[in-house]
């Protein structure tokens, strides 16, 4: 993607503000596809017709979580098991006015405009319908690097109502359009083209989602570390950076991004390998003489301690760690790597040798503009209490665990 000249985010925001289409390209490690995206309040029947004729995908309308609540739009399913967790709500049509069946270009445009109209009430929308609202995650692409969040972020950055309309771009032969074809589409229709990774980098460059506290010395059994606390502005959660040694700009640093685990890190629980991994990471950094541990306050893969204990109870009753989360209405993994990425940037880390067995973590950090030059395994020996848990992580979550057969 870097070899092809894309448009800048600044250029894209200006066009978006004027009601023009953008082509937004996903990352190669994700769907690797492009969508036509436009601000919801700028939609017309003619523009909807263009999207359906030239996009050929599924017409959707990304809106915020708050807007979904205001319009009482429930999710299509309680447990979203789609590959990338695409957040579809129940489908809708605008009721009344000149709208009829909901399927015409006029009706679809009116429905999308209604979603972006603060005066629209839940009773103004028929369910089911012909428009697929998508619930964008709070904090946008800094929380989830998807087209849904990109549409809402672009609207906000353009000073418009935070809602959009999008459709996947499919080739005439029915295959998904990839970057070379998308470049040709952009040229044909004189539409600017950007990638989500650049939008993430723009937001990280222009916004601060964390603030740091005072730096202190922390003597440990693995030598001295510098400890810097960070507070996440969006929710007040506090995180920690442990730093050893000095490093140069762009130097590949040994890094562990570790989500908090009170049971394992503090009490030495044998139901997981978290505590052992944390101590092994500290030992390796001490041995190397330099490195960073980002300790994220994301207990239970992001669901919190109370919910984690409910999941533990379900595991005692026979469910595995993934199904326990899904049973409780959570995703298998709800961790937010955007905050970790900004903490790393704040302390000067842009390239790293990442200590992790989780390929999703690598993809998650790289999505925020960081470079993982090497993935360093940090595998520990399983015990009778965590072997099934680790087997589940290997088989259902893609963790690279050679000690698990």
Swiss-Prot record:
Record-listed Mg(2+) 2 binding positions: 31, 147
InterPro entries (UniProt xref): DHBP_synth_RibB-like_a/b_dom (IPR017945), DHBP_synthase_RibB (IPR000422), GTP_cyclohydro_II (IPR032677), RibA (IPR000926), RibA-like_sf (IPR036144), Riboflavin_synth_RibBA (IPR016299)
Pathway the protein acts in: Cofactor biosynthesis; riboflavin biosynthesis; 2-hydroxy-3-oxobutyl phosphate from D-ribulose 5-phosphate: step 1/1; Cofactor biosynthesis; riboflavin biosynthesis; 5-amino-6-(D-ribitylamino)uracil from GTP: step 1/4
Active site: 333 (proton acceptor), 335 (nucleophile)
Gene3D superfamilies according to UniProt: DHBP synthase (3.90.870.10), GTP cyclohydrolase II (3.40.50.10990)
Catalysed reactions, as listed in the record: D-ribulose 5-phosphate = (2S)-2-hydroxy-3-oxobutyl phosphate + formate + H(+); GTP + 4 H2O = 2,5-diamino-6-hydroxy-4-(5-phosphoribosylamino)-pyrimidine + formate + 2 phosphate + 3 H(+)
Keywords associated with the record: GTP-binding, Hydrolase, Lyase, Magnesium, Manganese, Metal-binding, Multifunctional enzyme, Nucleotide-binding, Riboflavin biosynthesis, Zinc
Co-factor: note: Binds 2 divalent metal cations per subunit. Magnesium or manganese. Binds 1 zinc ion per subunit.
Positions marked as site (Essential for DHBP synthase activity): 130, 168
Residues annotated for D-ribulose 5-phosphate binding in this entry: 30-31, 35, 144-148, 168
One GO cellular component term: cytosol
Gene Ontology MF: a single term: GTP binding
SUPFAM superfamilies reported for this sequence: RibA-like, YrdC/RibB
GO biological process: riboflavin biosynthetic process
Entry cofactors: Mg(2+); Mn(2+); Zn(2+)
Region (GTP cyclohydrolase II): 206-405
EC number(s) recorded for this UniProt protein: 4.1.99.12, 3.5.4.25
Residues reported in the UniProt entry to bind Zn(2+): 261, 272, 274
Positions of Mg(2+) 1 binding: 31
Metal-binding is among the record's keywords: yes
Residues reported to bind GTP: 256-260, 277, 299-301, 321, 356, 361
Region (DHBP synthase) residue spans: 1-205
Role description: Catalyzes the conversion of D-ribulose 5-phosphate to formate and 3,4-dihydroxy-2-butanone 4-phosphate. Catalyzes the conversion of GTP to 2,5-diamino-6-ribosylamino-4(3H)-pyrimidinone 5'-phosphate (DARP), formate and pyrophosphate.
Similarity comment: family membership: In the N-terminal section; belongs to the DHBP synthase family. In the C-terminal section; belongs to the GTP cyclohydrolase II family.
Record-given protein name: Riboflavin biosynthesis protein RibBA
């Amino acid at each position: 993607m870097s070899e092809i000249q894309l448009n800048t985010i600044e250029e894209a925001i200006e066009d978006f503000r004027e009601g023009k289409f953008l082509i937004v390209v996903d990352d190669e490690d994700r769907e690797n596809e492009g969508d036509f995206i436009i601000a919801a309040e700028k939609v017309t029947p003619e523009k909807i017709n263009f999207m359906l004729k030239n996009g050929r995908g599924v017409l959707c309308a990304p809106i915020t979580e708050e807007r979904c609540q205001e319009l009482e739009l429930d999710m299509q399913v309680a447990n979203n098991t789609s590959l990338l967790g695409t957040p579809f709500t129940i489908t809708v049509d605008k009721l009344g006015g000149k709208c009829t069946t909901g399927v015409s270009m006029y009706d679809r445009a009116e429905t999308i405009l209604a979603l972006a109209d603060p005066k629209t009430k839940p009773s103004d929308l028929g369910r089911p319908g012909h428009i697929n609202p998508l619930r964008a995650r709070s904090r946008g692409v800094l929380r989830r690097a998807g087209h849904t969040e990109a549409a809402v972020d672009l609207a906000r950055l353009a000073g418009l109502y935070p809602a959009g309309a999008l459709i996947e771009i499919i080739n005439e032969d029915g295959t998904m359009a990839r970057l070379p074809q998308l470049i040709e589409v952009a040229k044909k229709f004189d539409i600017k083209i950007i990638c989500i990774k650049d939008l993430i980098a723009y937001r990280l460059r222009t916004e601060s989602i964390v603030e740091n506290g005072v730096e202190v010395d922390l003597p440990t059994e693995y030598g001295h570390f510098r400890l810097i606390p960070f507070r996440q502005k969006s929710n007040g959660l506090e995180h920690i950076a442990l730093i050893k040694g000095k490093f140069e700009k762009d130097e590949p640093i040994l890094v562990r991004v570790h989500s908090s685990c009170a049971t394992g890190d503090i009490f030495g629980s044998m139901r997981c390998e978290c505590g052992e991994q944390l101590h092994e990471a500290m030992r390796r950094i001490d041995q190397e003489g330099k490195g960073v541990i980002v300790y994220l306050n994301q207990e239970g893969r992001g669901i919190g301690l109370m919910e984690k204990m409910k999941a533990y109870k379900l595991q005692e009753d026979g469910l595995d760690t993934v199904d326990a989360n899904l049973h409780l209405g959570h995703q298998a993994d709800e961790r937010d790597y955007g905050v970790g990425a900004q903490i790393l940037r704040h302390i000067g880390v842009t390239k790293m040798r990442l200590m992790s067995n989780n390929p999703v973590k690598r993809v998650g950090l790289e999505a925020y503009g960081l470079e993982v030059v090497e993935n360093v395994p940090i595998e520990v020996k399983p015990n009778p209490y965590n072997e099934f848990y680790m087997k589940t992580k290997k088989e259902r979550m893609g963790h690279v665990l050679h000690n698990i057969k």
